């Protein structure tokens, strides 16, 4: 693939990564859509239908009987992750949501070390600590403290960790392609989300929702669902045609834009100097993480003799 096409894939991935956060926020906070569970279900359904329509020829179906055993744990964590992620987006301001979500990096690193034996350099660990310290400071400075919203984010961080570790292990141990993993994961998530929607949703409130015929709401709602599909697909493409480091850098750029741009979206961000300082410290930690990760990658690529001369 040409450099121009690679750059285009990366740009599209980052664009949809940002757009789904903002569109979810507008749907849930500005228009006060009554069910984050239904939104999660529709996004997952869109993902499944699109892959079934466009990529079915790339999905193996000869050994489907073994798929649920292999994928179901991932699907459970993924269902919790998307539900809590959308719920957290609607409950907290985007800057605070983004900062608190960085705590999942610590959990993922601990999980990688314990389960996968992955070790990282001390500067990388320190940069993650800076991220978390910033998030804690931002939370202390949050005068709109919402215990339910914070609970959503806590569960979201745990589910993100489980999802990340299980995704790595399923790709490594069971020889699934990325498209197959997304497809089967979405398929097994659907009944879980259907049950949650049936049990928890107030269908009368959903039917009587006042903005169903508001063109602007419908635009954001449809865009939110389409962004979920596009995000899943472009994430796979970005990872395939670039590198994990490139994806990481794009994620940091996205979070910087969401952190500061999110102050003006949703109307629920309340400025305090302590909160703003915490958000900035957490963002600096995220930038340092990418820098040290890049240096670590470059160091590993050096010949052994060159490595011994450095440091």
Regions found by a protein language model. Give the residues of each.
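Polytopic endomembrane small-metabolite transporters, centered on the Drug/Metabolite Transporter
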Residues: 1-311
